[in-house]
Regions:
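N-terminal amphipathic/basic leader segments beginning at the initiator methionine
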Residues: 1-27
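Alpha/beta enzyme core
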Residues: 2-7, 19, 32-37, 44-335
Length: 335
């Protein structure tokens, strides 16, 4: 960007900031409800609405309760949800077979939501950690190391299971090598060419995921283990661009950076480099951190929510996956 020479007092940058109308006219970034995807936690039973202690205001919902929530989301103009399953211990195994059960929790959720709200998009998680006894995102060898290609074969089954149930978008969050291309080819071969893939391309081995693992019930299974041999090192950004480039070449329709706030630089670099549909996930730890500050009166809730979400979009995000989606959309409706 090359501007002609400017100097004070002929140029006064405050001039356009003086009144609301001119501030609005020169605003470079705006938020709408159409920018958001709401992550939701879905559980078995009926009439169940169970609070997640580490995420104030977030609940584990049975399918019937989720449908009531979806009615509100549609009315607010939120285009999509991302359901995550709360899987009980009896359905967890070393081979994660429940992940591709056609009568499992997620396929039933997809069918129920699509029957009631066909216009609402659904993006399902393709990963094995809710279904494994060890809480890792894949199938392990005797030493606990994730077997990449064996895991990808299981992820293909999971993605096809979700596609058969009627999902709009599958979102592989596992960080296995080659899984986007393998899933894309399987979808094409099985008549699901219009099922989109949201690739968790730059998913970091972050300390911000704790409340999510509590919510889905995988924290106890994972214990003190970590996921550093497949999720990305928080120190790296060039590697993120390599991962994103690979996923685009393998057939991803959207790519994602996760978490959000600590990785705005990666988000900006990704948008500048690829100009490709780009999502960011404001993860559970970010939500919990802000919620704690709000509860103590340390930050203005509405102002900080909107500033944070605006920051994601200004940094390059086209899509913001956030637990604040419903609240933010309500605020935007008020104007």
């Amino acid at each position: 960007m090359h501007l002609p020479p400017q100097s004070f007092p002929l140029t006064r940058k405050r001039r356009n900031r003086k009144d609301d109308f001119s501030r609005r006219l020169m605003r470079e970034t705006t938020l709408t409800a159409a920018d958001f995807i709401l992550p939701v936690f879905v559980c078995e039973s009926e009439g169940k609405r169970e609070a997640v202690p580490s995420m104030p205001g977030v609940y584990r919902l049975s399918i019937d309760q989720l449908l009531a929530e979806c009615a509100e989301l549609v009315a607010l103009g939120i285009p999509a949800i991302a359901p995550f399953p709360v899987i009980s211990a009896e359905y967890k195994s070393a081979d994660a077979a429940a992940a591709y059960d056609p009568d499992g929790l997620i396929p039933r959720t997809v069918r129920a939501v699509k029957a009631a709200f066909p216009e609402l998009g659904i993006m399902t998680d393709v990963a094995l950690d809710p279904y494994t006894i060890h809480g890792q995102d894949g199938i392990t060898d005797a030493d606990g190391y994730i077997l990449n290609d064996t895991t990808v074969a299981t992820l293909i089954k999971q993605a096809l299971c979700h596609a058969d149930a009627g999902v709009d978008m599958v979102a592989p969050s596992d960080m296995m090598d080659g899984r986007i291309g393998a899933i894309r080819q399987a979808l094409e071969a099985n008549g699901h060419e219009n099922v989109r893939i949201m690739a968790y391309s730059a998913k970091y081995a972050s300390a911000y995921y704790g409340p999510f693992r509590d919510a889905v019930g995988s924290a106890a299974n994972l214990g003190k283990a970590d996921k550093r041999n497949y999720q990305m090192d928080p120190a790296n950004s060039n590697e993120a661009l390599h991962e994103i480039a690979l996923d685009i070449s393998e057939g991803a329709d959207f790519v994602m950076v996760k978490p959000g706030m600590p990785y705005l630089d990666v988000l900006r670099r990704a948008k500048d480099q690829f100009a490709f549909p780009l999502a960011v996930y404001q993860v559970s730890g970010e939500y919990a951190m802000l919620s704690a500050a709000f509860a103590n009166g340390w930050l203005d809730r509405e102002a900080v929510i909107m500033e944070t979400l605006l920051g994601f979009k200004r940094a390059g995000a086209d899509i913001i996956i956030t637990y604040f989606a419903k609240e933010a959309a309500t605020m935007l409706t008020r104007g």
